[in-house]
Amino acid sequence: MLDITYIRQNPDDVKEMLRRRQQQGDAPKVDRLLERDAERKAMVQRTDDLKALRNRVSKEIANIKRTGQGSADELIGQMKQVSDEIADLDLALSALEAEIEELLLTLPNKLHKSVPEGRSAEENVLYKGPVSFEHNLDFPVKNHLELGKSLGILDFERGAKISGAGFPVYTGKGARLERALINFMLDTHSANHGYTEVFPPFMVNQESLRGTGQWPKFADQVYHMPEDGLYAIPTAEVPVTNLHRGEILDADKLPIAYAAYSACFRREAGSYGKDTRGFLRVHQFNKVEMVRFTRPEASYEALEEILGHAEAILVALKIPYRVITLCSGDISANAAKCYDIEVWSPAENKYLEASSVSNFEDYQARRSNIRFKPDSKSKPEFVHTLNGSGLATSRLMVSLLEHYQTADGKLMVPEALKPYTGFEIIE
Protein backbone atom coordinates (compact mmCIF):
# COMPACT_ATOMS: atom_id res chain seq x y z
CA MET A 1 0.00 0.00 0.00
CA LEU A 2 1.28 3.45 -0.86
CA ASP A 3 1.69 6.12 1.80
CA ILE A 4 -1.20 8.60 1.58
CA THR A 5 1.24 11.42 2.40
CA TYR A 6 3.36 10.44 -0.61
CA ILE A 7 0.26 10.48 -2.83
CA ARG A 8 -0.79 13.93 -1.53
CA GLN A 9 2.65 15.35 -2.24
CA ASN A 10 3.31 13.52 -5.53
CA PRO A 11 0.03 12.88 -7.37
CA ASP A 12 1.64 13.36 -10.78
CA ASP A 13 4.37 10.83 -9.93
CA VAL A 14 1.71 8.30 -8.95
CA LYS A 15 -0.12 8.87 -12.25
CA GLU A 16 3.16 8.50 -14.15
CA MET A 17 3.77 5.21 -12.34
CA LEU A 18 0.31 4.04 -13.46
CA ARG A 19 1.15 5.04 -17.04
CA ARG A 20 4.40 3.08 -16.92
CA ARG A 21 2.51 0.05 -15.63
CA GLN A 22 0.00 0.34 -18.49
CA GLN A 23 -2.72 1.24 -15.97
CA GLN A 24 -3.56 4.72 -17.22
CA GLY A 25 -7.22 3.94 -16.69
CA ASP A 26 -6.65 3.97 -12.93
CA ALA A 27 -5.44 7.59 -12.89
CA PRO A 28 -8.91 8.90 -11.88
CA LYS A 29 -8.54 6.81 -8.70
CA VAL A 30 -5.76 9.16 -7.62
CA ASP A 31 -8.00 12.21 -8.02
CA ARG A 32 -10.86 10.45 -6.26
CA LEU A 33 -8.56 9.41 -3.44
CA LEU A 34 -7.32 12.97 -2.95
CA GLU A 35 -10.89 14.29 -2.98
CA ARG A 36 -11.93 11.78 -0.34
CA ASP A 37 -8.80 12.57 1.66
CA ALA A 38 -9.68 16.29 1.64
CA GLU A 39 -13.22 15.42 2.74
CA ARG A 40 -11.81 13.35 5.56
CA LYS A 41 -9.56 16.19 6.68
CA ALA A 42 -12.50 18.62 6.72
CA MET A 43 -14.67 16.08 8.55
CA VAL A 44 -12.01 15.46 11.19
CA GLN A 45 -11.60 19.20 11.68
CA ARG A 46 -15.37 19.69 12.03
CA THR A 47 -15.56 16.83 14.55
CA ASP A 48 -12.66 18.22 16.59
CA ASP A 49 -14.24 21.69 16.61
CA LEU A 50 -17.57 20.30 17.80
CA LYS A 51 -15.93 18.24 20.53
CA ALA A 52 -14.02 21.32 21.71
CA LEU A 53 -17.28 23.28 21.74
CA ARG A 54 -19.02 20.53 23.70
CA ASN A 55 -16.24 20.41 26.27
CA ARG A 56 -16.29 24.17 26.73
CA VAL A 57 -20.07 24.45 27.03
CA SER A 58 -20.21 21.42 29.33
CA LYS A 59 -18.04 23.35 31.77
CA GLU A 60 -20.42 26.32 31.50
CA ILE A 61 -23.39 24.04 32.21
CA ALA A 62 -21.61 22.57 35.22
CA ASN A 63 -20.85 26.07 36.52
CA ILE A 64 -24.49 27.18 36.11
CA LYS A 65 -25.69 24.12 37.99
CA ARG A 66 -23.10 24.64 40.71
CA THR A 67 -23.87 28.33 41.31
CA GLY A 68 -27.59 28.12 40.65
CA GLN A 69 -27.40 31.30 38.59
CA GLY A 70 -29.79 30.84 35.67
CA SER A 71 -31.04 27.86 33.66
CA ALA A 72 -28.85 25.49 31.67
CA ASP A 73 -31.74 23.92 29.75
CA GLU A 74 -31.09 25.78 26.49
CA LEU A 75 -27.38 24.93 26.54
CA ILE A 76 -28.15 21.30 27.34
CA GLY A 77 -30.49 21.17 24.34
CA GLN A 78 -27.83 22.68 22.10
CA MET A 79 -25.23 20.18 23.30
CA LYS A 80 -27.64 17.34 22.59
CA GLN A 81 -27.73 18.50 18.97
CA VAL A 82 -23.94 18.83 18.94
CA SER A 83 -23.53 15.28 20.30
CA ASP A 84 -25.92 13.96 17.66
CA GLU A 85 -23.92 15.70 14.93
CA ILE A 86 -20.66 14.27 16.31
CA ALA A 87 -22.16 10.78 16.27
CA ASP A 88 -23.30 11.26 12.66
CA LEU A 89 -19.86 12.55 11.70
CA ASP A 90 -18.16 9.58 13.36
CA LEU A 91 -20.28 7.18 11.30
CA ALA A 92 -19.64 9.12 8.09
CA LEU A 93 -15.92 9.33 8.87
CA SER A 94 -15.72 5.58 9.43
CA ALA A 95 -17.34 4.92 6.05
CA LEU A 96 -15.10 7.49 4.36
CA GLU A 97 -11.93 6.00 5.86
CA ALA A 98 -12.99 2.54 4.67
CA GLU A 99 -13.45 3.91 1.13
CA ILE A 100 -10.04 5.60 1.26
CA GLU A 101 -8.40 2.37 2.44
CA GLU A 102 -10.02 0.37 -0.36
CA LEU A 103 -8.78 2.90 -2.91
CA LEU A 104 -5.27 2.70 -1.44
CA LEU A 105 -5.36 -1.09 -1.54
CA THR A 106 -6.09 -1.08 -5.28
CA LEU A 107 -3.16 1.15 -6.25
CA PRO A 108 0.03 -0.68 -7.27
CA ASN A 109 3.47 -0.14 -5.82
CA LYS A 110 5.96 2.50 -6.86
CA LEU A 111 8.52 1.36 -9.42
CA HIS A 112 12.23 1.43 -8.70
CA LYS A 113 14.13 3.79 -11.00
CA SER A 114 16.04 0.86 -12.54
CA VAL A 115 12.91 -0.92 -13.81
CA PRO A 116 13.02 -0.79 -17.63
CA GLU A 117 10.22 0.85 -19.57
CA GLY A 118 8.00 -1.57 -21.45
CA ARG A 119 4.42 -2.46 -22.24
CA SER A 120 4.46 -6.25 -21.94
CA ALA A 121 6.60 -9.36 -21.38
CA GLU A 122 8.05 -8.98 -24.87
CA GLU A 123 9.96 -5.92 -23.62
CA ASN A 124 11.54 -7.52 -20.56
CA VAL A 125 15.31 -7.10 -20.45
CA LEU A 126 17.97 -9.81 -20.18
CA TYR A 127 19.85 -9.33 -16.91
CA LYS A 128 22.10 -12.39 -16.82
CA GLY A 129 22.88 -15.36 -19.02
CA PRO A 130 22.03 -17.53 -20.73
CA VAL A 131 23.91 -19.76 -18.27
CA SER A 132 24.63 -23.11 -19.92
CA PHE A 133 25.71 -26.56 -18.76
CA GLU A 134 26.83 -29.46 -20.93
CA HIS A 135 24.19 -32.12 -21.52
CA ASN A 136 24.41 -34.81 -24.19
CA LEU A 137 21.12 -34.39 -26.05
CA ASP A 138 22.11 -35.50 -29.56
CA PHE A 139 18.83 -37.41 -29.98
CA PRO A 140 15.14 -36.50 -30.25
CA VAL A 141 14.27 -35.20 -26.78
CA LYS A 142 11.01 -36.38 -25.23
CA ASN A 143 8.99 -33.70 -23.50
CA HIS A 144 8.31 -34.08 -19.79
CA LEU A 145 4.85 -35.54 -20.39
CA GLU A 146 6.09 -38.28 -22.71
CA LEU A 147 9.06 -39.17 -20.54
CA GLY A 148 7.10 -39.04 -17.28
CA LYS A 149 4.43 -41.33 -18.68
CA SER A 150 6.88 -43.81 -20.22
CA LEU A 151 8.81 -44.07 -16.94
CA GLY A 152 5.64 -44.33 -14.86
CA ILE A 153 6.56 -41.40 -12.61
CA LEU A 154 3.90 -38.83 -13.61
CA ASP A 155 0.17 -39.41 -13.97
CA PHE A 156 -1.85 -36.43 -15.13
CA GLU A 157 -4.77 -38.58 -16.28
CA ARG A 158 -5.48 -39.95 -12.81
CA GLY A 159 -4.90 -36.51 -11.33
CA ALA A 160 -7.62 -35.20 -13.64
CA LYS A 161 -9.91 -38.06 -12.58
CA ILE A 162 -9.42 -37.17 -8.93
CA SER A 163 -9.49 -33.38 -9.05
CA GLY A 164 -9.68 -32.10 -12.62
CA ALA A 165 -7.09 -30.81 -15.06
CA GLY A 166 -3.99 -29.20 -13.60
CA PHE A 167 -3.55 -31.51 -10.59
CA PRO A 168 -0.56 -33.82 -11.19
CA VAL A 169 0.12 -37.13 -9.45
CA TYR A 170 3.73 -38.19 -8.81
CA THR A 171 4.23 -41.93 -8.44
CA GLY A 172 7.07 -44.23 -7.39
CA LYS A 173 10.48 -42.78 -8.07
CA GLY A 174 8.81 -39.66 -9.45
CA ALA A 175 7.39 -38.91 -6.00
CA ARG A 176 10.80 -39.60 -4.47
CA LEU A 177 12.47 -37.28 -7.00
CA GLU A 178 10.00 -34.48 -6.25
CA ARG A 179 10.59 -34.85 -2.50
CA ALA A 180 14.34 -34.90 -3.12
CA LEU A 181 14.13 -31.59 -4.97
CA ILE A 182 12.20 -29.98 -2.13
CA ASN A 183 14.53 -31.27 0.59
CA PHE A 184 17.64 -30.33 -1.38
CA MET A 185 16.41 -26.76 -1.81
CA LEU A 186 15.38 -26.40 1.84
CA ASP A 187 18.69 -27.81 3.06
CA THR A 188 20.68 -25.55 0.73
CA HIS A 189 18.88 -22.39 1.80
CA SER A 190 18.96 -23.18 5.51
CA ALA A 191 22.50 -24.61 5.73
CA ASN A 192 24.30 -22.51 3.10
CA HIS A 193 22.30 -19.30 2.78
CA GLY A 194 21.29 -18.56 6.37
CA TYR A 195 17.51 -18.98 6.17
CA THR A 196 15.40 -20.24 9.06
CA GLU A 197 13.12 -23.01 7.88
CA VAL A 198 9.37 -22.54 8.39
CA PHE A 199 6.57 -24.99 7.68
CA PRO A 200 3.50 -22.72 7.42
CA PRO A 201 -0.25 -23.32 7.17
CA PHE A 202 -1.54 -23.90 3.64
CA MET A 203 -4.73 -21.94 4.35
CA VAL A 204 -4.93 -18.30 5.41
CA ASN A 205 -7.54 -15.69 6.25
CA GLN A 206 -8.40 -12.72 4.08
CA GLU A 207 -6.35 -10.34 6.23
CA SER A 208 -3.23 -12.32 5.36
CA LEU A 209 -3.95 -12.10 1.62
CA ARG A 210 -4.62 -8.40 2.01
CA GLY A 211 -1.34 -7.95 3.83
CA THR A 212 0.80 -9.36 1.01
CA GLY A 213 -1.26 -7.78 -1.77
CA GLN A 214 -3.08 -10.77 -3.26
CA TRP A 215 -6.37 -9.29 -2.00
CA PRO A 216 -8.39 -7.65 -3.45
CA LYS A 217 -6.56 -7.35 -6.79
CA PHE A 218 -6.01 -11.09 -7.34
CA ALA A 219 -9.09 -12.38 -5.56
CA ASP A 220 -10.16 -14.34 -8.65
CA GLN A 221 -6.93 -16.37 -8.57
CA VAL A 222 -7.31 -17.94 -5.12
CA TYR A 223 -9.40 -20.89 -3.97
CA HIS A 224 -11.89 -19.84 -1.29
CA MET A 225 -13.62 -21.78 1.49
CA PRO A 226 -16.36 -19.24 2.34
CA GLU A 227 -17.88 -21.29 5.16
CA ASP A 228 -14.63 -20.99 7.10
CA GLY A 229 -13.36 -17.66 5.78
CA LEU A 230 -10.18 -19.34 4.57
CA TYR A 231 -8.22 -19.34 1.33
CA ALA A 232 -5.78 -21.90 -0.10
CA ILE A 233 -2.41 -20.18 -0.37
CA PRO A 234 -1.13 -19.24 -3.85
CA THR A 235 2.41 -19.09 -2.44
CA ALA A 236 4.15 -19.52 0.92
CA GLU A 237 4.97 -15.81 0.67
CA VAL A 238 1.52 -15.16 2.14
CA PRO A 239 1.70 -17.06 5.45
CA VAL A 240 5.42 -16.45 5.96
CA THR A 241 5.24 -12.67 5.48
CA ASN A 242 2.22 -12.57 7.77
CA LEU A 243 4.19 -14.22 10.56
CA HIS A 244 5.13 -10.68 11.59
CA ARG A 245 1.90 -8.85 10.70
CA GLY A 246 1.20 -6.14 13.26
CA GLU A 247 4.60 -6.50 14.92
CA ILE A 248 7.50 -4.17 15.67
CA LEU A 249 10.64 -6.16 14.90
CA ASP A 250 13.88 -5.97 16.83
CA ALA A 251 16.22 -3.91 14.66
CA ASP A 252 19.22 -5.89 15.91
CA LYS A 253 17.71 -9.07 14.44
CA LEU A 254 17.28 -7.65 10.93
CA PRO A 255 17.53 -9.01 8.35
CA ILE A 256 15.17 -11.87 9.13
CA ALA A 257 15.23 -14.61 6.50
CA TYR A 258 12.85 -17.55 6.18
CA ALA A 259 12.70 -20.48 3.77
CA ALA A 260 9.46 -22.43 3.52
CA TYR A 261 8.11 -25.33 1.53
CA SER A 262 4.43 -25.35 0.65
CA ALA A 263 2.03 -26.67 -1.87
CA CYS A 264 0.62 -23.73 -3.86
CA PHE A 265 -2.90 -23.45 -5.24
CA ARG A 266 -3.94 -21.15 -8.09
CA ARG A 267 -7.15 -21.01 -10.05
CA GLU A 268 -5.32 -19.62 -13.11
CA ALA A 269 -8.44 -17.74 -14.15
CA GLY A 270 -7.92 -16.19 -17.57
CA SER A 271 -5.47 -18.86 -18.76
CA TYR A 272 -7.71 -19.88 -21.66
CA GLY A 273 -5.64 -20.06 -24.84
CA LYS A 274 -2.34 -20.50 -22.99
CA ASP A 275 -0.29 -23.69 -23.09
CA THR A 276 -1.68 -25.75 -20.23
CA ARG A 277 -0.04 -29.12 -21.01
CA GLY A 278 1.47 -31.02 -18.11
CA PHE A 279 3.47 -28.85 -15.72
CA LEU A 280 3.36 -25.78 -17.96
CA ARG A 281 0.27 -24.51 -16.14
CA VAL A 282 -1.18 -26.28 -13.11
CA HIS A 283 -3.56 -25.50 -10.26
CA GLN A 284 -1.41 -27.18 -7.61
CA PHE A 285 2.36 -27.24 -7.45
CA ASN A 286 5.19 -27.38 -4.92
CA LYS A 287 7.52 -24.52 -4.17
CA VAL A 288 10.23 -23.49 -1.76
CA GLU A 289 9.94 -19.80 -0.95
CA MET A 290 12.51 -17.38 0.46
CA VAL A 291 11.20 -14.37 2.42
CA ARG A 292 13.31 -11.56 3.82
CA PHE A 293 12.59 -8.61 6.17
CA THR A 294 15.23 -5.87 5.97
CA ARG A 295 16.03 -2.28 6.79
CA PRO A 296 15.00 -0.04 3.87
CA GLU A 297 18.57 0.91 2.98
CA ALA A 298 19.57 -2.76 2.69
CA SER A 299 16.75 -4.10 0.56
CA TYR A 300 18.29 -3.83 -2.91
CA GLU A 301 21.46 -5.55 -1.78
CA ALA A 302 19.18 -8.24 -0.33
CA LEU A 303 17.38 -8.53 -3.67
CA GLU A 304 20.62 -9.48 -5.40
CA GLU A 305 21.47 -11.93 -2.62
CA ILE A 306 18.12 -13.71 -2.90
CA LEU A 307 18.56 -13.90 -6.66
CA GLY A 308 21.96 -15.49 -6.13
CA HIS A 309 20.49 -18.03 -3.72
CA ALA A 310 17.88 -19.10 -6.27
CA GLU A 311 20.53 -19.32 -8.98
CA ALA A 312 22.70 -21.50 -6.74
CA ILE A 313 20.05 -24.22 -6.89
CA LEU A 314 20.12 -24.26 -10.69
CA VAL A 315 23.91 -24.22 -10.78
CA ALA A 316 24.05 -27.20 -8.41
CA LEU A 317 21.52 -29.07 -10.56
CA LYS A 318 23.23 -27.95 -13.80
CA ILE A 319 19.97 -26.65 -15.25
CA PRO A 320 20.46 -24.04 -18.03
CA TYR A 321 18.78 -20.74 -17.23
CA ARG A 322 18.69 -17.02 -17.74
CA VAL A 323 17.60 -14.05 -15.60
CA ILE A 324 15.42 -11.25 -16.92
CA THR A 325 14.38 -7.94 -15.40
CA LEU A 326 10.65 -7.43 -15.70
CA CYS A 327 9.67 -4.23 -17.47
CA SER A 328 7.20 -1.69 -16.11
CA GLY A 329 4.28 -3.18 -18.02
CA ASP A 330 4.88 -6.79 -16.91
CA ILE A 331 5.94 -6.47 -13.28
CA SER A 332 3.40 -7.48 -10.63
CA ALA A 333 1.35 -4.78 -8.92
CA ASN A 334 3.01 -5.43 -5.56
CA ALA A 335 6.67 -5.34 -6.62
CA ALA A 336 8.93 -2.31 -6.93
CA LYS A 337 11.43 -4.43 -8.88
CA CYS A 338 11.38 -8.05 -9.98
CA TYR A 339 13.66 -10.58 -11.64
CA ASP A 340 12.38 -13.75 -13.28
CA ILE A 341 14.59 -16.82 -13.55
CA GLU A 342 13.70 -18.89 -16.59
CA VAL A 343 14.88 -22.45 -17.18
CA TRP A 344 15.49 -23.83 -20.65
CA SER A 345 13.17 -26.51 -22.04
CA PRO A 346 14.82 -28.29 -25.00
CA ALA A 347 11.60 -30.09 -25.91
CA GLU A 348 9.55 -26.89 -25.93
CA ASN A 349 12.50 -24.95 -27.38
CA LYS A 350 11.85 -22.02 -25.07
CA TYR A 351 12.50 -20.66 -21.61
CA LEU A 352 9.99 -21.31 -18.82
CA GLU A 353 9.58 -19.13 -15.74
CA ALA A 354 10.67 -21.06 -12.64
CA SER A 355 11.24 -18.28 -10.12
CA SER A 356 10.38 -14.66 -9.40
CA VAL A 357 12.55 -12.61 -7.05
CA SER A 358 10.96 -9.36 -5.90
CA ASN A 359 11.56 -6.33 -3.70
CA PHE A 360 8.29 -4.91 -2.40
CA GLU A 361 10.01 -2.11 -0.47
CA ASP A 362 7.47 -1.00 2.21
CA TYR A 363 4.36 -1.85 0.15
CA GLN A 364 3.54 -5.10 1.97
CA ALA A 365 4.86 -3.88 5.31
CA ARG A 366 2.51 -0.90 5.21
CA ARG A 367 -0.46 -3.17 4.42
CA SER A 368 0.60 -5.62 7.14
CA ASN A 369 1.87 -3.02 9.63
CA ILE A 370 5.30 -4.61 10.01
CA ARG A 371 7.74 -2.11 11.50
CA PHE A 372 11.04 -1.78 13.32
CA LYS A 373 12.68 0.89 15.48
CA PRO A 374 16.05 1.98 14.04
CA ASP A 375 17.15 2.79 17.61
CA SER A 376 15.62 3.14 21.06
CA LYS A 377 14.81 6.84 20.58
CA SER A 378 13.29 6.56 17.10
CA LYS A 379 9.70 6.13 16.03
CA PRO A 380 8.87 2.80 14.37
CA GLU A 381 9.44 2.66 10.61
CA PHE A 382 8.21 0.17 8.05
CA VAL A 383 10.59 -2.61 7.07
CA HIS A 384 11.14 -3.65 3.47
CA THR A 385 9.98 -7.13 2.48
CA LEU A 386 11.37 -9.31 -0.28
CA ASN A 387 10.67 -12.78 -1.55
CA GLY A 388 11.93 -15.22 -4.12
CA SER A 389 10.99 -18.65 -5.37
CA GLY A 390 13.80 -20.94 -4.50
CA LEU A 391 12.33 -22.62 -6.60
CA ALA A 392 8.98 -23.88 -7.89
CA THR A 393 9.41 -27.56 -8.70
CA SER A 394 6.92 -27.87 -11.56
CA ARG A 395 8.76 -26.11 -14.38
CA LEU A 396 12.08 -26.98 -12.81
CA MET A 397 11.01 -30.62 -13.15
CA VAL A 398 10.21 -30.01 -16.83
CA SER A 399 13.77 -28.86 -17.48
CA LEU A 400 15.29 -31.57 -15.28
CA LEU A 401 13.43 -34.40 -17.02
CA GLU A 402 14.32 -33.09 -20.45
CA HIS A 403 18.00 -32.45 -19.75
CA TYR A 404 18.76 -35.61 -17.78
CA GLN A 405 17.06 -38.14 -20.07
CA THR A 406 19.07 -40.64 -22.08
CA ALA A 407 18.71 -41.75 -25.68
CA ASP A 408 17.16 -45.06 -24.55
CA GLY A 409 14.44 -43.31 -22.50
CA LYS A 410 15.95 -43.50 -19.01
CA LEU A 411 16.42 -40.63 -16.55
CA MET A 412 19.72 -39.92 -14.80
CA VAL A 413 19.43 -38.32 -11.36
CA PRO A 414 21.39 -35.05 -10.96
CA GLU A 415 24.47 -35.51 -8.79
CA ALA A 416 23.17 -33.04 -6.18
CA LEU A 417 20.00 -35.08 -5.67
CA LYS A 418 21.52 -38.57 -5.36
CA PRO A 419 21.97 -38.32 -1.56
CA TYR A 420 18.25 -37.59 -1.31
CA THR A 421 16.86 -40.15 -3.75
CA GLY A 422 18.91 -43.20 -2.86
CA PHE A 423 19.07 -44.12 -6.56
CA GLU A 424 20.97 -42.80 -9.57
CA ILE A 425 18.70 -43.71 -12.47
CA ILE A 426 15.01 -44.10 -13.24
CA GLU A 427 14.15 -46.66 -15.90
UniProtKB/Swiss-Prot annotation:
Reaction catalysis annotation: tRNA(Ser) + L-serine + ATP = L-seryl-tRNA(Ser) + AMP + diphosphate + H(+); tRNA(Sec) + L-serine + ATP = L-seryl-tRNA(Sec) + AMP + diphosphate + H(+)
The keyword Protein biosynthesis appears for this protein: yes
Pathway in which this enzyme or protein is active: Aminoacyl-tRNA biosynthesis; selenocysteinyl-tRNA(Sec) biosynthesis; L-seryl-tRNA(Sec) from L-serine and tRNA(Sec): step 1/1
Principal location class: cytoplasm
CDD domains: SerRS_core
GO molecular function, one term: serine-tRNA ligase activity
E.C. number(s) listed in UniProt: 6.1.1.11
Binding site for ATP: 266-268, 282, 353-356
Pfam families (UniProt xref): Seryl_tRNA_N, tRNA-synt_2b
CC per GO annotation: cytoplasm
Gene Ontology BP term (one): seryl-tRNA aminoacylation
Binding site for L-serine: 235-237, 289, 389
Purpose of the protein: Catalyzes the attachment of serine to tRNA(Ser). Is also able to aminoacylate tRNA(Sec) with serine, to form the misacylated tRNA L-seryl-tRNA(Sec), which will be further converted into selenocysteinyl-tRNA(Sec).
Family from the record: Belongs to the class-II aminoacyl-tRNA synthetase family. Type-1 seryl-tRNA synthetase subfamily.
Assembly and oligomerization: Homodimer. The tRNA molecule binds across the dimer.
Protein name: Serine--tRNA ligase
Gene source species: Chlorobaculum tepidum (strain ATCC 49652 / DSM 12025 / NBRC 103806 / TLS) (Chlorobium tepidum)
Gene this chain is encoded by: serS
